């Protein structure tokens, strides 16, 4: 299955504790159907001290389901993502609301 959400996309959270907040995707895990979004779904982890890093409680992003986030189009509104095959045979993502190409 082709990836509708990719690294670097600006997305908005649709459900949950962070509903309505936007952020940038910095990692997608297609096998798990999740993504990591910068500053969204933050959790606290207890870090054991090592020679390389200090111990303590750190905040980090937890994965969020792809179904719970939506791509934010150029108009700033969330939209669904579809695919279109151009005349030269290239497959590009399009915003369903406006029909505009996302990447090309």
UniProtKB/Swiss-Prot annotation:
UniProt cross-references to InterPro entries, sorted A to Z: KOW, Rib_uL2_dom2, Ribosomal_uL24, Ribosomal_uL24_CS, Ribosomal_uL24_KOW, Translation_prot_SH3-like_sf
CDD domains recorded: KOW_RPL26
GO CC aspect terms: cytosolic large ribosomal subunit
Disulfide bonds: none
GO BP terms, alphabetized: translation
One GO MF term attached to the UniProt entry: structural constituent of ribosome
Protein keywords: Ribonucleoprotein, Ribosomal protein, RNA-binding, rRNA-binding
Subunit structure: Part of the 50S ribosomal subunit.
Function according to Swiss-Prot or TrEMBL: One of two assembly initiator proteins, it binds directly to the 5'-end of the 23S rRNA, where it nucleates assembly of the 50S subunit. One of the proteins that surrounds the polypeptide exit tunnel on the outside of the subunit.
Similarity comment: family membership: Belongs to the universal ribosomal protein uL24 family.
Protein's name in the database: Large ribosomal subunit protein uL24
Organism: Bradyrhizobium diazoefficiens (strain JCM 10833 / BCRC 13528 / IAM 13628 / NBRC 14792 / USDA 110)
């Amino acid at each position: 299955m082709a990836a509708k959400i990719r690294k670097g996309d600006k997305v908005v959270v649709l459900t949950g504790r962070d509903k309505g907040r936007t952020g940038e995707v910095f990692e997608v895990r297609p096998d798990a159907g999740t993504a990591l979004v910068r500053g969204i779904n933050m959790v606290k982890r207890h870090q054991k001290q090592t020679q390389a890093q200090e111990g303590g409680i750190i905040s980090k992003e937890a994965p969020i389901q792809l179904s719970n986030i939506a791509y934010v189009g150029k108009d700033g509104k969330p939209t669904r993502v579809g695919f279109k095959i151009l005349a030269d045979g290239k497959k590009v993502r399009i915003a369903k609301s406006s029909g505009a190409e996302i990447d090309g």
